[in-house]
Amino acid sequence: MLAAALASLMILTSGQDIASTQDPAVPQPAAVDLEDIIVEGRPLENLTQTFVREVAAPARNRGMARWRNGLCVGVANLQPEMAQYITDRVSTVAQDVGLKPGEPGCEPHVLIIATVDASAFTRQFVEVRPRIFRVGGSGMDRGGNAFEAFVENDQPVRWWNISVPVNDDTGLIAIRMPGYGAPSIGVQPSRITTQIVDDTKRAFIIVDVDKTKDVSLEQLADYIAFITLAQVDPEADTSGYATILNVFDDPAQTRTLTNWDRAYLQGLYTTVRRRQNTGAQRTEVVDSIVRAHHRLTSVEAPE
């Protein structure tokens, strides 16, 4: 299994052979959706701030990252038709936020691996290839404690994102990487704005097939799409919101990406990420999500 996954990292395939399979659902209280806010008059900005604060999990001391131009998805250890469905769904959601999906045979940035024992597999994977998870550059991941939680957690799906500070104008890496000299970057001095932003570079997603049996392939693919495109805190409490992130707690309640999810992704990918202060950056994302919400609801409103 591990050998196949490591081979996939280099030549990433769209799959091999294991069926998708999670523990019984736990009922959840009524969740807040965007339409509820309109009906009940609750403050959208406050709810959005809380959602972003709960969900967003950027690298240590960095802003919220996103993919720059496009991404290539590779899926290993699933039947070909299932692997292709997940690949296509993640690529479609990526395209919806303005990213270019990878061509067939592309070198993957996102590795999705299905396994019957995610904990054992992850420990072995990390032991064999530690450097692909902890690259060593400053501000590229959430740190040692988060990495240990990634290895040891018992969730149906676990993930690890790698991002890097870059010059927003050029896309060039703006930090010193292990084994390389310090980068030469020209920036405009300012106390308010910055040219240095964070780009997602890699995502590793490991699916435990024994713990995903109560969700459909469509639900699993949408869940994977969301955690691929955004840096999500695995411990986020989103029980009060209608979001695909709740799918393993209550599969019947969340069938697909919700308006919350779509607004979050659209807001993340349309915001201008130039604030020097990370708190101000997050406020920009919140404002962008609110604008995305207004666009979504205006399109869906009956005439």
Place the predicted regions along the sequence by residue:
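Compositionally biased P/S/T/G-rich terminal and signal peptide-adjacent segments
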Residues: R42-W67
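Bacterial N-terminal signal peptides
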Residues: A3-T13
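Long, folded non-catalytic interaction modules
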Residues: G74-R89, A94, G98-E303
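Short boundary motifs at domain starts and secondary-structure transition points
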Residues: P27-A30, A59-R66, I196
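Acidic/histidine-rich, surface-exposed loop or edge segments in extracytoplasmic proteins
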Residues: V32-E35, G63-L78
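N-terminal secretion/transport leader regions
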Residues: P27-P43
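A domain-level signal for the mature, folded cores of soluble proteins
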Residues: I18-T21, G63, W67, E103
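Boundary of Sec targeting at the N-terminus
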Residues: G15-Q16, S20-Q22, Q28, E40
